[in-house]
Structures are given as C-alpha cells and as structure tokens.
Design a protein with these regions (language model features):
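Catalytic phosphate/metal-binding cores of nucleic-acid and nucleotide-processing enzymes, i.e., regions
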Residues: 1-133
C-alpha cells in the first residue's frame, strides 16, 4: 500500500498529482454529460499488523452508470474508467478486469484525458444526456 502523498512502484514524483487531476477532470466531464459517476478509490485496513486490500485488484479509477434507452425503458449500464497519465499502461490485473467487465456487457474505458473518454463513450453510443457546457 502507498502512504498518502507517496508514489507507487515505478511512478515518478508528481505523477500521483497528475493522476488525481485526471480523475477529477473525467468525473467533471461525466457529470457535465449527465451521468452518475464516482471515484473508486483503493481501500485497505490493517489486520494483525498487515494491510489487507478491501477492493478488487484491477478495477477502474471511476465507476459510472451509463444510461441506455431500449424499448421505451431506461437501463443503467455498468461502466468503469481507468485513468492513465504519462507512459503508464495497464497492469495484467487491470487487463483481466477490463475483459471481465466488457464480457459481462459493461463498458471499460482507458483514458488519458477527458476528451478521449468522452469521444469513446460517444463512439459506443452514450451521448451526453445534458447539453455540453
């Protein structure tokens, strides 16, 4: 587990702040598009002196409910956004989780900026539910 303000293995100083900024920008864009979305932070507790993760490895940084209209009914589709900055790529656990979400009918997007995320959602047929600001 990383201490607050620290960095994960392989991250350069300052990249944690860039990642947090990207997550905030993507959350803002999803809100502007009219979708319910929230950050999916890593959670851990200490048990007998050891840190134990409470979250699934590989999950996206953001969870979102994507609205889809079908046969006059509104459905919420599970979606996740994995935010990547710099040259970082997905870990094997993230790729496995992405496949699981997509194979279950959900949407999993890897985004390096808010515009890329919005474009990919629109390409998948999830247009903004609210007019663009």
């Amino acid at each position: 587990m990383r201490a607050k303000g620290g960095t994960s293995r392989g991250q350069k100083p300052g990249s944690l702040e860039a990642h947090e900024r990207l997550v905030a920008e993507c959350l803002e864009e999803l809100a502007l598009m009219g979708f319910a979305a929230w950050e999916n932070p890593r959670r851990a507790v200490q048990v007998n002196g050891r840190w134990v993760s409470l979250t699934k490895a590989g999950r996206g940084d953001i969870q979102v409910l994507l609205a889809r209209q079908a046969e006059g009914r509104l459905f919420g589709i599970h979606g996740e956004v994995e935010c990547k900055t710099g040259q970082s790529g997905q870990s094997p656990k993230q790729r496995a989780h992405m496949r699981m979400v997509r194979n279950s009918g959900g949407v999993y997007i890897v985004a390096r900026d808010r515009n890329e995320m919005r474009a990919e959602l629109e390409l998948l047929g999830f247009a903004a539910r609210l007019p663009a600001a």
